[in-house]
């Protein structure tokens, strides 16, 4: 048996495949089986644009020629998945995700794997269409690109602020999802309340087409105590935070993504009274190694994040320094049970691993913005702790509107300035999305404890969030 030249199969592989038929009298049935043996090799290697065929020929001296038709890559084009809408992502960013070299036979299995990996690690979605090439013996590929809106502008308001600096907040955010066309993301956020002003900005640039990213973040905030025991002391503070983070996907399938990341950060903060007396001046440097897991299934979503953090605290006010280590974790599980019913579980935890004194901002807090609704933000704290939220939901439509009931609980352990070590609450809430650009939610929480330390807790607490997105 003689074979035409192949880019994929070696002479040894092809001869081994037809070995059972060599030296025998073959009929049409055996010829079909012989071709199938060769085509099976192509499929095992992941090549679907290749095929062994028999061309019309005259058999001479018992030698049969099998023609190996291998669809070499011809034209590769990019098109928008939405008719009439242009995509903004640079073609080079998309094409470098695939091994589609002109004149080379492309591996379908590898291309499918690259497609899945790209779609799971990017905010744009691709699909690939194959067709017979314009040139004989070639296969043309058309890649369809579906992008989210290139930029979003958001106005928001909520009741998640601190009582001491203003519970009710407003803000604005701007996101450019592909600033230079490489899916490099720029985000700017401004938040204000009665006694606080803060700004946050980040720029994230991909290092390849498969989710490896470098993100630089900066934030600055000023705060003034406008309520509480310290109001008359003209307490003001300001802080800065700078971080650099590297993300890299470690394992990606169509339903799962495991990402590892490293982060270096530095935070400085200073608090003063009467504009002259500095009561706190600290700097915290930290190194973080973490893992993020995303798992998707129809009706179910699981997200988990675990971190190991090493920190160095410098207190300039009292000329003290310390080094400490901790583990933190977060998990959310959302499950759509049947029809419109579902539930969500959220949990967070921290474990102090040892070292010196920990910065107050790194303690584990319990309160409305930290796991247990119905109380003021950061009501109590300690070095160690955990909280859990259980929510039962009824979905009103497919746009995000729902009603829900919840149970929150949290507990602290380790070093703490507070006598109380646990908080809990129940409540009800609703989310409403009347139009695509407007989303709102509200909750009424009923705390189990009416007195925490010297603070009296209201019977019920109302919270809201309103987002308008363009």
List where the protein language model places each region.
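Repeated loop/turn-to-beta-strand initiation elements of outer-membrane beta-barrel proteins
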Residues: 126, 151-153, 180-186, 209-215, ...
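Transmembrane beta-strand segments that form the barrel wall of outer-membrane beta-barrel proteins
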Residues: 151-161, 172-178, 182-194, 199-201, ...
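Periplasmic polypeptide-binding modules associated with outer-membrane biogenesis and secretion
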Residues: 1-161, 189-198, 327, 347-349
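Residues that define the transmembrane beta-barrel architecture of outer-membrane proteins
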Residues: 137, 166-170, 195-199, 238-242, ...
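Outer-membrane beta-barrel "beta-signal"
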Residues: 174, 430-434, 439, 444, ...
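C-terminal outer-membrane beta-barrel translocator/porin domains of Gram-negative envelope proteins
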Residues: 270-402, 406-409, 413-414, 455-456
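Outer-membrane beta-barrel proteins
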Residues: 176-180, 202-209, 247-253, 289-299, ...
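Outer-membrane beta-barrel translocator/channel fold
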Residues: 219-249, 253, 267-274, 444-461
């Amino acid at each position: 048996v003689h074979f035409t030249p192949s880019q994929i199969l070696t002479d040894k592989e092809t001869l081994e495949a037809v070995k059972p038929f060599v030296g025998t009298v073959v009929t049409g049935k055996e010829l079909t089986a012989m071709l199938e043996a060769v085509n099976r090799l192509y499929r095992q290697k992941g090549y679907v644009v290749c095929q062994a065929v028999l061309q019309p020929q005259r058999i001479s001296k018992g030698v049969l020629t099998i023609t190996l038709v291998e669809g070499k890559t011809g034209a590769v084009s990019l098109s928008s998945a939405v008719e009439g809408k242009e995509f903004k992502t640079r073609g080079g960013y998309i094409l470098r995700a695939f091994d589609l070299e002109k004149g080379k036979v492309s591996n379908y299995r590898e291309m499918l794997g690259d497609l899945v990996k790209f779609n799971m690690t990017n905010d744009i979605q691709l699909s690939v269409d194959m067709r017979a090439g314009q040139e004989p013996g070639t296969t043309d590929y058309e890649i369809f690109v579906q992008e989210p809106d290139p930029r979003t502008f958001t106005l928001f308001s909520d009741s998640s602020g601190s009582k001491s600096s203003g519970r009710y907040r407003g803000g604005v955010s701007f996101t450019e999802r592909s600033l230079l066309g490489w899916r490099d993301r720029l985000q700017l956020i401004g938040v204000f309340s009665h006694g606080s002003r803060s700004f946050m900005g980040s720029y994230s640039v991909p290092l390849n087409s498969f989710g490896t990213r470098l993100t630089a973040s900066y934030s600055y905030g000023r705060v003034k105590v406008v309520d509480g025991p310290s109001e008359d002391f003209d307490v003001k503070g300001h802080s800065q935070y700078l971080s650099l983070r590297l993300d890299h996907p470690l394992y990606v399938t169509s339903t799962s993504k495991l990402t590892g990341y490293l982060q270096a950060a530095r935070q400085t903060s200073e608090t003063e009274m009467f504009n002259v007396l500095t009561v706190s001046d600290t700097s915290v440097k930290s190194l973080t190694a973490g893992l993020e897991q995303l798992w998707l299934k129809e009706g179910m979503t699981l997200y988990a994040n675990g971190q190991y953090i090493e920190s160095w605290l410098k207190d300039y006010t009292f000329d003290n320094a310390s080094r400490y280590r901790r583990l933190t974790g977060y998990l959310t599980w959302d499950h759509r049970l049947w029809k419109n019913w579902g539930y969500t579980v959220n949990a967070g935890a921290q474990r102090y691993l040892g070292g010196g004194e920990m910065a107050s901002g790194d303690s584990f807090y319990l309160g409305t913005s930290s796991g247990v609704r119905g109380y003021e933000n950061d009501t109590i704290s300690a070095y160690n702790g955990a909280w859990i939220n259980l929510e039962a939901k009824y979905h009103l439509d497919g746009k995000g509107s729902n009603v829900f009931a919840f149970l929150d609980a949290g507990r602290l352990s380790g070093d703490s300035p507070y006598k109380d070590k646990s908080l809990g609450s129940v409540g009800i809430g609703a989310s409403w999305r009347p139009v695509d650009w407007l989303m709102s939610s509200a909750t009424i929480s009923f705390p189990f404890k009416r007195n925490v330390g010297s603070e009296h807790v209201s019977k019920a607490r109302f919270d809201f969030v309103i987002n308008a997105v363009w």
